[in-house]
C-alpha cells in the first residue's frame, strides 16, 4: 500500500521568460515500511521535493498524497495538525529546542497534540537509540551524533505515516555518520517505519531499499 504519492509535482520560481523549474513533473510512490533514498547533486531539486512531500512548501501544481489525503486541499491549520501527526522530520542541523531537555524534545510532538505519551514505545525507541542515560541532558551538552539520535526519536514518537530525512548526516564526521545511518536503517526495519531520505551521497543511498535519482527537477531513475 502506498503511504506517499507525488502526482505530476511541479515547483516553478520566477516569471517567463526567466522561469526556474525546481521540480518539473515528478511522479513516484513510496510503499508502507519502505526505506527510499532520493539522490541528487546540489540544485537537482531534491530538497525542494522534500519540502513539498512534507507540506512545508506548496507546489506550483500537482499533488502530494499522504495516507490518502491530498495536502493541497488542506488549509494552514489543517496542514499543521496533519503534518505533526503523520510526518516526522530529521534535519541536517537537528532542530532541537535548546531550552528543553532530551526527554522533553522527544515527546514534544505528542504533547503539542494534547495526547498521552506511549511510554512502552518511548522506552523502545530510547533503548534502540542508546539514549537511556541522556534523557535529562540539555541539547548543548550532547555531541552532534547524540543530538541527531534525539531528532530521530522525536521523528518516530508519533508513529508517523512517513519520516523525511534531509541530509541527516551532513553535519557529522564519517564514523558518527555511519552510526546514525545504521540507526535510521534499523529503526525503519524494527518499527516498519516508512522513510524517505534525501542525500547527495551515493554510498549513503545504497543503505536504502530503493534509490530514486533526481536531476534538473526530474526523476531519471
What residue ranges belong to the model's regions?
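ABC family nucleotide-binding domain
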Residues: 3-207, 211-214
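Generic C-terminal helix-cap and adjacent flexible tail
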Residues: 220-221
